[in-house]
Amino acid sequence: VTIIVDHYTGNKLSIEQLKQYGVTKIKFDYQLIKNITLYKSDLERVQYLSRAASDIGIKPVLIGIETPLQYDLVKDTCGDFLAQGELFCSPIEPSELITTLNKMNR
C-alpha cells in the first residue's frame, strides 16, 4: 500500500507524524515551491522539509518546478526527491498520454 499526502505545507503535521501513519510520499504544495527563486527563506524551507522527509524514508515530490533555475536550486540540496512541473511536461489531455510517453522514451 502506498500512502501519499497531497498539498503538504508542513504547517499542520510534522514529517515524523506522517511517517508514523505509514505515509510513503509527500507532494509538496505548489505554494512552497513558487517563490524559491525570490526568497531564500522559501528555498531553505523546501530544502529542509525535503531532506527531512528523504532522511526518514518518505519520498518528497516537489510540485510546480517550472523553470531551470528552480530545478537547479533544488536538485543537489533536497535529498532524494521527485519533481513535477511544466519544466518537464505541460499538462496534457488523456488522449495524448500514450503519444507523449512514447516521445519521452525515445
Go through the PLM ranges and name each one.
Residues V1-R106:
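EAL-family c-di-GMP phosphodiesterase catalytic domain
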